[in-house]
From Swiss-Prot:
Pfam families reported in the protein's UniProt record: NusB
Any one GO molecular-function label of the UniProt entry: RNA binding
Function: Involved in transcription antitermination. Required for transcription of ribosomal RNA (rRNA) genes. Binds specifically to the boxA antiterminator sequence of the ribosomal RNA (rrn) operons.
Name used for this protein in its record: Transcription antitermination protein NusB
Organism the protein comes from: Gloeobacter violaceus (strain ATCC 29082 / PCC 7421)
Keywords: RNA-binding, Transcription, Transcription antitermination, Transcription regulation
GO cellular component, one term: cytosol
UniProt keyword Iron, yes or no: no
Gene3D superfamilies on file: NusB-like
Protein family membership: Belongs to the NusB family.
Single biological process term from Gene Ontology: transcription antitermination
Length: 211
């Protein structure tokens, strides 16, 4: 996993925990938000594994029940199919859970947290201006009407594209799309991609020479 990708996810989780009035947030507050996000990830890993165990037990129980209580062959097949679906769901959940410990370990690394702090600091300073830019570039929408997760993904992308200029705008868009795939909906993926491309056109980023 790339350090900056993990930092973006930490920053995204931290923004969601910020108070509406960001003016009094200090570096210490930002650090506490990031640490709270890491703790949340640990808890999610444990809960996901527990749910996987529960689903496996449920699948096993349905298989046993199908042998004893199913009145017809067709009913037995349905029970077996349901048991297999539960098992597959559990396996997928375990696979996702196994990635989280590595994610959490890397999230504790200095360079990851440093970039997360940098993203959050820029957002605290320039968040209002970024929201105005989004309002200008969204067709028929306002920032306040967006779901929180979609709004924060867009804000983070603008922090990297406009404020920090820490990655090429194409990378910022691609990373925002990946965050949307993980944390939001298919519709949001297309929406976020479209909004950020309108930002690029509005700021004429494609016409600027690459550094």
């Amino acid at each position: 996993m790339q350090a900056r990708r993990i930092a973006r996810e930490l920053a995204l989780m931290s923004i969601g925990q910020m108070p509406a009035d960001r003016s009094r947030l200090q570096a210490k507050n930002l650090e506490e938000l990031v640490l709270a996000s890491v703790r949340t990830l640990r808890e999610e890993a444990n809960e996901s594994l527990q749910r996987a165990c529960t689903e496996l037990r449920q699948g096993h129980n349905r298989l046993e029940a199908s042998e004893l209580t199913a009145p017809t062959v067709e009913a037995a097949r349905r029970e077996v199919a349901a048991a297999i679906a539960l098992a597959e769901q559990a396996i997928n959940r375990v696979g996702a859970s196994l990635e989280l410990p590595e994610f959490v370990r890397l999230a504790d690394e200095l360079q990851v947290r440093a970039y997360a702090f940098e993203l959050l600091g820029a957002f605290v300073r320039e968040g209002d201006n970024l929201d105005k830019l989004l309002d200008t570039c969204m067709e028929g929408w306002q920032v306040e009407r967006l779901t929180r997760i979609d709004r924060d993904i867009l804000r983070l992308a603008l922090v990297e594209m406009v404020e920090l200029k820490s990655v090429p705008f194409r990378v910022a868009i691609d990373e925002a799309v990946e965050l949307a795939k993980k944390y939001s909906t298919d519709t949001a993926v297309r929406f976020i991609n479209g909004v950020l491309r309108r930002v690029v056109q509005h700021l004429q980023l494609e016409q600027r020479p690459r550094r």
